[in-house]
């Protein structure tokens, strides 16, 4: 490359006399592509003769500038002739300071101001465009100048600032004769951007600040408007005027995009808007270029720098690795990730050099890479290494760019796919220079160095950033901590001996009860299922209130941006500041508890939840596509042939206009199809197969292209439709490659195991249509699906039992539920409709209801029911049990999931279902077998002792307890007798202080360990809690709606009617 091809640099030398002419000397700059442009130090002198000219003419200078319009001129006043100051860029030379002598020429101080105003931090991304800034003046070799902290501005006011400290330039010889190479100084200390000092004569230079609307280029004339600002990109500028006092960010980006397209018309980019960054020039800040994040950043006279990034900004993930090293703590300190105490005498944990946070060694591999590098006080013993010297301005830059980084993370999430597509670009801050613990690794003591202590790997950051974020609230419950733990929200100690605080049962986030209301809704889910994502919502931009979301907490639930104040050792009332054993620390902490911080009064029992054994009603959103294709068809009512694109799914057949549209001509639900058959073998029929419904018959004559494969295609269509009509594909009964022992499968026409006539699945499919995607529940012997009766359209629940899953000795278990359902007939028991048996399966058809009692409890406002609603439901349950016990039928698996509701009202009718565990037990008989769900079983069953019908009454007591409190009554870790005898444990003030004593007495009568002391159904119905006028009135309203009196008795009418007259109550059941 020829020297003339380099960007040009002008040198100006002025004696102290103000009448001297300004002489310019042309320099060419040399840059190496392998070295960052702001680290370049070698400049080649292009003309040695020009350097000797100290009194050149102004016309020479003007001619040089006109000849080289891309060159820069920088002037500087000095008491010596050889002072030097210049400024350039690597990729394209800026002409911000270029002036023709006949135009408005800047004063030397103006040049100084312009040169210093373009100084930016090395941390800023604008260095991707290669800004360079050097200042030099002659002095003796090796000399160092002291800093001047005070200076006088042009108004005579004294101000404070920082100064340049430079090395001495050393001329070196080059191979080419007559040429010299200068090693330019290296900037060590960043100065105040608007202040330049001359140390040669200890004089102070006052920079010139130009007016806001002063134009430096006439590339575009400004328009008249209320808001005027300028766009700049390299040597190009443009003035923009808009109406109003603000411009929207979208309009500003559009103006910048149009500006770039105008000045670079030959450069085409399909998604240029993704690469554009907008900065404003702010001379008052340390970083001159400030990222524009809001419309208020652009004011009248603002200079907007348009920067084109190297990668799309919506694919960048900002990663700030922690600088961890082993640390010995002299006072008790807590982990900022899990909140537990760092145990040990020495080397208890890890401390981040950047942000000062403290972690367990076991937590090091789980913490997010979100260090903010803002430790309040950096130890003076550890100096800044060159690789980390640019961290000085890190806080200011991140403060101004915090929200832009968050928005970049939000935009980056959908860019990563599972199929191996391009992953988002990762921007790692300069804290991490390749070593495992950060840039200061070599400056730590050797004994504290470690190559294993680092945050989670980058692939986890990518997976976390691209993961869909939802506002999932924490599920807090009272927890007793065995180790001293701090609240991860307020960073204060959780005090007490037991039940010190609240812990999320999913992500194990710990906090005070009073702080639980202020914790962000960012639960990360079960920690056992996702070990490596225990708090990975770093830089989450989903929440609009980012200032709150980025508040001072870090924990297992969601590890936010690291806080400025880490978990410091407890002081004052929170603990003794002196080092000592953990025992004395805990004792001091407990003795200093304030009065207002009392131990939580909530129950430590397990919250009510759906037991794994039963499924909640689910339904897939998208039906499975079974077959599709073009079909030509007609009906028995219309002979005109029509062509449509048929799609067969689990719900029906849909006829679309074409393959891609969503508009359809007609839909045939599967429950309306009565039969599908091929055409007769004779050649008289002009169709391939027919679909018979209750309204008409569809004849399929083929596909639009009548080929040889039409008959084969017709066969596949009939097979697919018949498969869709079949109830459910039977599950395999093969285990480990060998078929298990099964019941003897009778042939068609024989009597089945349950005494029912064997029927084919085709016959069953003609009566009922089962929706395989609508699973209502799953029990011991089978799965319950939703279905519909084809003829009358009644919705039913079909329990499908696979006989091949049971060995021969379990045949009685298959027969028990069907026999009980056939035997009972009561409004409080689910209605049995029909039972059909095929060669390998049994179909039990029952009525379908709206939901279950558990769903009603969980969906209530407080997570529990009121006493009035609970009394209403329990009264119906007791009446159904009274009927079953009269028939010597014990349910044995009574729980809210098996109590169905026929409506979504506040006072619905309930019915008992799922008699898979039911037993026939006499009044004085006992059974010994495995039955029921452990959470609702009586102690005698859990201890494998004999049980009788009082087993159901224990289950009723548990149901009443969970309905009123929303939690299970017992904790599995303690003996059940001890828990029952401990009234404080069983009935904590929250919420039992709001519940009547009669309700507690009713529960105590049912939850009796001794069966002889447990309430019977009759005694429970006559208990005082179940005897009040409001309950009787509500039940009478229900009976009126059902049309049958099945809960209350006529003998009670006289008593309650007298109550109405005595209290002047108007009955609502009439």
Curated annotation (Swiss-Prot):
> Which reaction equation describes what this protein catalyses?
L-seryl-[protein] + ATP = O-phospho-L-seryl-[protein] + ADP + H(+); L-threonyl-[protein] + ATP = O-phospho-L-threonyl-[protein] + ADP + H(+)
Q: Name one GO cellular component term.
A: cytoplasmic side of plasma membrane
Q: What is this protein called?
A: Serine/threonine-protein kinase dkf-2
Question: Family per UniProt?
Answer: Belongs to the protein kinase superfamily. CAMK Ser/Thr protein kinase family. PKD subfamily.
What are the catalytic residues? 893
- Organism in which the protein naturally occurs: Caenorhabditis elegans
Give the residue ranges for region: Disordered.
Answer: 42-77, 152-178, 200-222, 537-583
Q: In which tissues is it expressed?
A: Expressed in the late embryo, all larval stages, and adult in the intestine and in cells positioned near the posterior bulb of the pharynx.
Query: Chief location of this protein?
Result: cytoplasm
Q: Which Gene3D superfamilies match?
A: 3.30.60.20, Pleckstrin-homology domain (PH domain)/Phosphotyrosine-binding domain (PTB) (2.30.29.30), Transferase(Phosphotransferase) domain 1 (1.10.510.10)
For the null mutant, the annotation states: Increase in adult life span. Increased levels of daf-16 translocate into the nucleus in response to heat stress. Hypersensitive to killing by bacteria.
- Gene Ontology terms describing biological process: antibacterial innate immune response; defense response to Gram-negative bacterium; defense response to Gram-positive bacterium; determination of adult lifespan; innate immune response; intracellular signal transduction; phospholipase C-activating G protein-coupled receptor signaling pathway; protein import into nucleus
Q: How is its activity regulated?
A: Activated by DAG and phorbol esters. Phorbol-ester/DAG-type domain 1 binds phorbol ester with low affinity. Phorbol-ester/DAG-type domain 2 binds phorbol ester with high affinity and targets the kinase to the cell periphery, enabling phosphorylation and activation by colocalized tpa-1. Both domains 1 and 2 appear to bind DAG with equal affinity so may contribute equally to translocation and activation.
Q: Please state every residue range assigned to the domain named PH.
A: 624-726
User: Which co-factors does it depend on?
Assistant: Mg(2+)
Q: What class of enzyme is it?
A: transferase
Q: What is the effect of changing residue 332 to G?
A: Loss of sensitivity to phorbol ester or DAG stimulation of kinase activity. No effect on sensitivity to phorbol ester, loss of DAG stimulation of kinase activity
* Intracellular or extracellular location(s): Cytoplasm; Membrane
Q: Which residues carry this modification: Phosphoserine?
A: 925, 929
| Zinc finger regions, Phorbol-ester/DAG-type | 321-371, 473-523
Please describe, based on the UniProt annotation, the reported consequence of changing residue 643 to A.
Small increase in basal kinase activity, no effect on sensitivity to phorbol ester stimulation of kinase activity
UniProtKB keywords: ATP-binding, Cytoplasm, Immunity, Innate immunity, Kinase, Magnesium, Membrane, Metal-binding, Nucleotide-binding, Phosphoprotein, Repeat, Serine/threonine-protein kinase, Transferase, Ubl conjugation, Zinc, Zinc-finger
Domain Protein kinase positions: 770-1026
Q: How is it modified after translation?
A: Phosphorylation on Ser-925 by tpa-1 is the dominant regulator of catalysis, phosphorylation on Ser-929 by tpa-1 has a lesser effect. Prolonged phosphorylation results in ubiquitination and degradation.
Q: Which PANTHER family match?
A: PROTEIN KINASE C, MU, SERINE_THREONINE-PROTEIN KINASE
- Any single Pfam family the record assigns to this protein: C1_1
